[in-house]
Amino acid sequence: MRTTIRIDDELYREVKAKAARSGRTVAAVLEDAVRRGLNPPKPQAAGRYRVQPSGKGGLRPGVDLSSNAALAEAMNDGVSVDAVR
């Protein structure tokens, strides 16, 4: 189909340069751009990964899992929660 559109001069220069670099027509470059705009590629799902354990694992001795303050202190390497604030 033949049609007339108005586009920015700078954009036209970019399209024309891309067409020249790729050995295609301006119409083909514009058609591809419109198709991609109307039907963008679907994002691919991230591949699964596995966390590799390091060290001997397990709980750090003396950390009370029922206390948020104790957990925060353990995560901050002994610095008290009040000192972090």
Curated annotation (Swiss-Prot):
Presence of the UniProt keyword Cell membrane in the record: no
Any one annotated GO CC term: plasma membrane
Annotated keywords: Toxin-antitoxin system
Any matching Pfam family: RHH_1
InterPro entries (UniProt xref): CopG (IPR002145), Ribbon_hlx_hlx (IPR010985)
Region annotation (Disordered) ranges: 37-60
TM annotation in the entry: none
Any one GO BP annotation for this protein: positive regulation of growth
Function comment: Antitoxin component of a type II toxin-antitoxin (TA) system. Upon expression in M.smegmatis neutralizes the effect of cognate toxin VapC43.
Protein name: Antitoxin VapB43
Organism the protein comes from: Mycobacterium tuberculosis (strain ATCC 25618 / H37Rv)
